[in-house]
């Protein structure tokens, strides 16, 4: 698989603290890499650093084998699209208008959207099952619908890599599974790569091809979910005694927390 993203020895210092320390991992086309770890481990910070939103990191970040520093913000937005955590989104824009914002990196300052741009946005809405919501105001949608719209906006950028910050936060179980399944389908169907901060370990184990376990800003373990979610790693990262095991009905990894460390 072709590496879309390579991060080597990435560090980030902010407000007197080392938030990231020597983080190394890669993401390839056709795979979903999950960033897991306790609150404060550095997952969201790592996504912001990779995207270029938070400059000043040490180490090396390469996108499509070019240093991140070689990209202008506009050029980077043509390669990497971000899907933030769901916000209120109560501004008076329709779904179609929000999705069309994904074309901004491809347009000049005073350039209007073309028929091709509108076609790209419509295809993204169709892929995310939001086309029937196109004329609704974004603030009237449910959490799951809003998340699909944000993914459609990201697809409209025509990126190579998606960065998703807890895409299932504040969603019920049905929508959590639906969003993660959608991300997986898009990655394989569109040939994209994706890096997602995932809070729920069972969701990460079920849908991610690989996971990167962060603890105190450093990589504690990286690899297939079954290889990373070991009792020793879980104790070191989360401070609990826990055991991952395959569900006898589905084969998906489940997690049992036995007690505190």
Ranges and model annotations:
Residues 59-67, 76:
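Conserved ABC transporter NBD signature motif
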Residues 158:
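Conserved catalytic motifs of ABC-family nucleotide-binding domains
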Residues 51:
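Helix-to-loop junction immediately C-terminal to a conserved catalytic motif
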Residues 162-166:
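Catalytic Walker B motif of ABC-type/P-loop ATPase nucleotide-binding domains
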Residues 137-141, 145:
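Conserved ABC ATPase signature
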Residues 36-38:
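The feature captures the beta-strand-to-loop junction immediately N-terminal to the Walker
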